[in-house]
């Protein structure tokens, strides 16, 4: 039984693929020791072959016909060959599928060399996750906040994206949908996009690029492709499977035409829309030509029509039966043009950049220098900037370069005269700072921004004229009545005419009626005052005389809701302020006379009426910048010699502010300001010198109702209005819109 096995070792060796190590040591009769892994013979080998056959879909029946008519060696050889063939076919199929998968995944096809199989599988999984979004969003709307409607969510998304949503047919480019946010972005009404194609809205030179992005055919993807996400050039080949895949990403940049819809200066924040247009545009266009903005479009290819939606009959008859559509968001792309673009659209550059070494030698110049100073960049390279500076300004410029080196990164500005190419002198403002090596902390070079001062001022003036002509800076004053500022010295020393508006812009003709009404109303509210410049408001060392006239009030405080102004006559306001400033500079007390105490006779008579918020009364005797000077009760320097001048009010826990300027905030005065002051002065006009405190009349009670808080009034509480409450108030309160 063991003889055939011992006789055929060579035959068995020839049947085995590859070299077989046979030491030849006989272990037993008919047995030979063989190194290496060798499968057993007989039923084991046949069962292994049958397992591989089952893997290929073939049953063990093909071996049944060899059981009787072939020897066992031939059957084993066929089984080994069949197994190798099956493995080869399986490997070929796997390689084919992985190659297709690699072509479908953009990150794989963008690699320089072919990745291995594990890398392809890993990138495919990542790509599928990115196509699904974050992985936790669902189509049932569970990701949407419950307190937001669909319309509100759409507006929030478009506002955050700062763009507009549009849907176009992939084959024809017909606009299926566009959001209303296209108006603030491209200044196009929504109706202009409906019924048109996207090819009509883009620049003629970008039509082919757009058609390539919308196409899903195989012919459009031959050649090299630039991947915008990775910044690499893909290899040549067909990408039809990716182009036809649902949800395939599209990202491209094109130029879209800007419309001419009227600007809504209320909703578009006035100047921001114009600045955005020029920042994202391609420069000024010629007269009659369309203006284009650079738009970055990102989106996906989707099936069209969606499930459950049918195409209208008119679209079917027109042949617009596209199977795909592009759903994308268009955002304005900031252009990288080095030319500075101002609001008028017709300006030339006013500044250029230059780089210098520590000695002032020019190592780099911005090409904008051609339009600013007339030199070519090569004319300036390698030269000292002092060569172009005026001889009288060279020392000043040299010191500024030495100083900026010591500042180490801080900006230093200097103005000097620069010689242009036409031998003329130009006033240049240079803002410079140093760049330091982050490792060695040494100064590498100096960066300078050089600006033509005169040309910049001219362009700013032209910009302002453009704004006023377009109506972008016209304030709507129909809801805010504003009174004019009386003649006087402003903060910067500039005299402001009484008829001049609070705003620096010129008046718009549309609001002439409003300004006329304001002028009429302020004339009615103004209290005449004829205080001469040489007359002293309060004599030093003399008690306060109650029988004073209107001359004692150099200015009347009139409060308009939202605006507080100080009004006085044109003839005496400047003189009064100059006299006050002289008194302050000499260190004298503004009102050092004996203040008569206010008796409480007239206060209890008013306790049965509701009181309004208090406000300070008196004349404009204290205009000091120090907040402590706004009340004579706040510091010993401004108090009267008699310490108990206001003892009655102090005991009642009610402070009486006698400064005329410390209570001009909007919350301090409610009611009729013109009537209050006219009644207040009429009472003083009717007083006699012998009666320091006349009896309270009906009109007097109405006046004090708006002036003094009553002690014990539940509406006032225990609030004590001291100077700390008005410490943050300036002499000229800011205007709040």
From Swiss-Prot:
Record-linked NCBIfam families: sensory_box (TIGR00229)
Biased composition (Low complexity): 627-642, 659-688
Organism: Danio rerio
PAS domain mapped to chain residues: 149-221, 340-406
Stated role: Transcription factor that plays a role in the development of the hypothalamo-pituitary axis. Specifically recognizes the xenobiotic response element (XRE). Isoform 1 acts as a transcriptional activator. Isoform 3 acts as a transcriptional repressor.
Domain PAC: 413-456
Protein name according to UniProt: Aryl hydrocarbon receptor nuclear translocator 2
Extent of Basic and acidic residues compositional bias: 64-73
């Amino acid at each position: 039984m063991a003889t055939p096995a011992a006789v055929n070792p060579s035959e068995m060796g020839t049947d085995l693929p590859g070299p077989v190590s046979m030491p030849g040591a006989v272990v037993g009769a008919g047995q030979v020791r063989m190194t290496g892994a060798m499968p057993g013979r007989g039923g084991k080998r046949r069962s292994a072959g049958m397992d591989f056959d089952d893997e290929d879909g073939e049953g063990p029946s093909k071996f049944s016909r060899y059981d009787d008519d072939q020897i066992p060696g031939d059957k084993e050889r066929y089984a080994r060959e069949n197994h190798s063939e099956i493995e080869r076919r399986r490997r070929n199929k796997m390689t084919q599928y992985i190659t297709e998968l690699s072509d479908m995944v953009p990150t794989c096809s963008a690699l320089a060399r072919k990745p291995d199989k594990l890398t392809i599988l890993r990138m495919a999984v990542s790509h599928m996750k990115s196509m699904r979004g974050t992985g936790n969003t669902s189509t049932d709307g569970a990701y949407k906040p419950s307190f937001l409607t669909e319309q509100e969510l759409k507006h929030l998304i478009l506002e955050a994206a700062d763009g507009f949503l549009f849907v176009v047919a992939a084959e024809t480019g017909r606009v299926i949908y566009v959001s209303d946010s296209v108006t603030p972005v491209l200044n196009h009404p929504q109706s202009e996009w409906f019924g048109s194609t996207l090819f009509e809205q883009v620049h003629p030179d970008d039509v082919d690029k757009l058609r390539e992005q919308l196409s899903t055919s195989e012919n459009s993807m031959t050649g090299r492709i630039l991947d915008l996400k990775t910044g690499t050039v893909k290899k040549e080949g067909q990408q039809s499977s990716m182009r036809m895949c649902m949800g395939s990403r599209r990202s491209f940049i094109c130029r879209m035409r800007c419309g001419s819809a009227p600007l809504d200066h209320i909703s578009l924040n006035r100047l921001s829309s114009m600045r955005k247009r020029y920042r994202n545009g391609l420069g000024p266009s010629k007269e009659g030509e369309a203006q284009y903005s650079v738009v970055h479009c990102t989106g996906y290819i989707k099936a069209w029509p969606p499930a459950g939606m049918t195409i209208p009959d008119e679209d079917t008859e027109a042949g617009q039966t596209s199977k795909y559509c592009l759903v994308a968001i268009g955002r304005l792309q900031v252009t990288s043009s080095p030319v500075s673009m101002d609001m008028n659209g017709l300006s030339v550059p006013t500044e250029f950049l230059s780089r210098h070494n520590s000695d002032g030698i020019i190592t780099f110049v911005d090409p904008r220098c051609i339009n600013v100073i007339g030199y070519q960049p090569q004319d300036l390279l390698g030269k000292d900037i002092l060569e172009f500076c005026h001889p009288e300004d060279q020392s000043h410029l040299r010191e500024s370069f030495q100083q900026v080196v010591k500042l180490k990164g801080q900006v230093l500005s200097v103005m000097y005269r620069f010689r242009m190419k036409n031998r003329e002198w130009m006033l240049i403002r240079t803002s410079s700072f140093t760049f330091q090596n982050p490792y060695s902390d040494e100064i590498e070079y100096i960066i300078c921004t050089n600006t033509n001062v005169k040309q910049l001022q001219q362009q700013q003036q032209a910009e302002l004229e453009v704004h006023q002509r377009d109506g972008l800076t016209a304030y709507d004053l129909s809801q805010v009545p504003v009174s004019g500022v009386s003649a006087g010295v402003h903060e910067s020393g500039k005299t402001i005419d009484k008829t001049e508006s609070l705003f620096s812009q010129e008046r718009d003709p549309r609001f002439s009626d409003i300004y006329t009404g304001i002028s009429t109303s302020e004339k009615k509210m103004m209290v005449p005052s004829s205080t001469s410049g040489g007359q002293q408001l309060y004599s030093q060392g003399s008690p306060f005389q109650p029988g004073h006239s209107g001359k004692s009030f150099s200015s009347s405080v009139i409060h308009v809701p939202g605006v507080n102004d100080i009004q006085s006559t044109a003839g005496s306001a400047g003189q009064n302020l100059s006299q006050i400033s002289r008194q302050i500079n000499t260190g004298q007390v503004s009102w050092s006379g004996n203040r008569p105490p206010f008796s409480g006779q007239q206060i209890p008579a008013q306790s049965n009426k509701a009181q309004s918020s208090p406000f300070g009364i008196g004349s404009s005797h204290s205009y000091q910048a120090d907040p402590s000077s706004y009340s004579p009760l706040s510091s010993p320097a401004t108090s009267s010699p008699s310490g108990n001048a206001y003892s009655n009010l102090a005991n009642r826990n009610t402070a009486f502010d006698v400064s005329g300027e410390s209570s001009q905030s909007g919350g301090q005065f409610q009611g009729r300001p013109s009537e209050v002051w006219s009644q207040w002065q009429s009472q003083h006009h009717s007083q006699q010198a012998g009666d320091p405190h006349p009896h309270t009349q009906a009109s007097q009670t109405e006046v004090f109702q708006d002036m003094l808080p009553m002690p014990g009034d539940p509406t006032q509480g225990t609030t004590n209005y001291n100077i700390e409450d008005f410490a943050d108030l300036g002499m000229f309160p800011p205007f709040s819109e």
